[in-house]
Amino acid sequence: MNNLRVIMSVLLAVLVFTATVSESAEEMGKGEVTISLRCKTKTECLKNIACEACVDCRCDKGICKCHGFTAETNNPTV
């Protein structure tokens, strides 16, 4: 009887682990995130992780640069 409990708990743990991993894999595949700051077009900057909080991210001379953050537009400090 003890073996049955162990088998059932291991099976349940494997099912929960599999469901969690597959859900995480789906979320990771939703959008591509670029870590490099190099760019050729503005759309490459929009996928960049450094420009997530940026309101106006531009590709200046091959490098993504932020020209304004969300916090600055919502709560101006000046």
Curated annotation (Swiss-Prot):
Recorded superkingdom: Eukaryota
Stated family: Belongs to the DEFL family.
Gene Ontology CC: one annotated term: extracellular region
UniProt keyword list: Antimicrobial, Disulfide bond, Fungicide, Plant defense, Secreted, Signal
Species of origin: Arabidopsis thaliana (Mouse-ear cress)
Major subcellular location class: secreted
GO BP term (any one): defense response to fungus
Subcellular location per the Swiss-Prot or TrEMBL entry: Secreted
Protein name, per record: Defensin-like protein 287
Disulfide bridge map: 39-59, 45-64, 51-66
Cleavable signal peptide: 1-24
Ion transport listed as a keyword: no
